UniProtKB/Swiss-Prot annotation:
A Pfam cross-reference name: PIG-L
Keywords recorded for this protein, A-Z: Hydrolase
Superkingdom, taxonomy of origin: Bacteria
InterPro entries, alphabetized: GlcNAc_PI_deacetylase-related (IPR003737), LmbE-like_dom_sf (IPR024078)
Gene3D superfamilies membership: LmbE-like
Name of this protein: Uncharacterized deacetylase YaiS
Family per record: Belongs to the PIGL family.
Gene behind the chain: yaiS
EC number: 3.-.-.-
GO molecular function, a single term: hydrolase activity, acting on carbon-nitrogen (but not peptide) bonds, in linear amides
């Protein structure tokens, strides 16, 4: 599975290998690929995380979901966390802006000594409109990255047919659970 990442810590361009994890809301990345990120971070791979929306729909606004997310992603080993403020439950209306934002992040905000080799993002068999929109934006914006993997979340349809499975040790699952505990909302 990790032939793209395991061969060496340097990419073909003599840059550090990197991962880009993209989620629609605070907690999506942690739920969907948290254990994998913890494993890859321990291997020394650079990890950047992008949370596309505020995630505040259905909350009273007192809890800062971005702060929860920053703390959780730090536990997973993310080196860089970027929170965008697209409207929660309205991501499908902002598709072009999300594509532009992701392209800008890839081009201008990832350190110049890092080459993104893999993307973890939402997938197209998800019933949440924000998840589906983030999947669509990710597929366009990340089209030049060698590997794009979709991760499962609780709103996944039964039609989701995973083709890649990552085996993770219990220690990484424990790290994932610790990260999820940072989400009080």
């Amino acid at each position: 599975m990790d032939k793209v990442l395991d061969s060496a810590l340097l990419s073909s361009a003599n840059k550090r290998k990197g991962i880009l994890a993209i989620g629609a809301h605070p907690d999506d990345i942690e739920l969907g690929c948290g254990a994998s990120l913890a494993r890859l971070a321990q291997k020394g791979i650079y990890i950047a995380a992008v949370v596309m929306t505020t995630g505040n729909s259905g909350t009273d606004g007192i809890i800062d979901r971005h702060e929860e997310s920053r703390n959780a992603l730090k536990i997973l080993g993310c080196h860089q966390t970027i929170h965008l403020n697209f409207a929660d439950t309205r991501a499908h209306l902002q598709l072009n802006d999300m594509i532009s934002a992701l392209e800008d992040i890839i081009k201008n905000q990832i350190p110049s000594d890092v080459e993104i080799m893999r993307v973890y993002t939402m997938h197209d068999a998800d019933r949440h409109q924000d998840h589906l929109a983030v999947y669509q934006a990710s597929m366009v914006a990340c089209r030049t990255i060698p590997q794009i993997l979709g991760y499962e979340t609780p709103s996944t349809w039964l039609s989701f047919m995973p083709q890649v499975f990552e085996s993770v040790k219990e220690e990484y699952f424990t790290v994932k659970l610790a990260a999820l505990k940072k989400h009080k909302s």
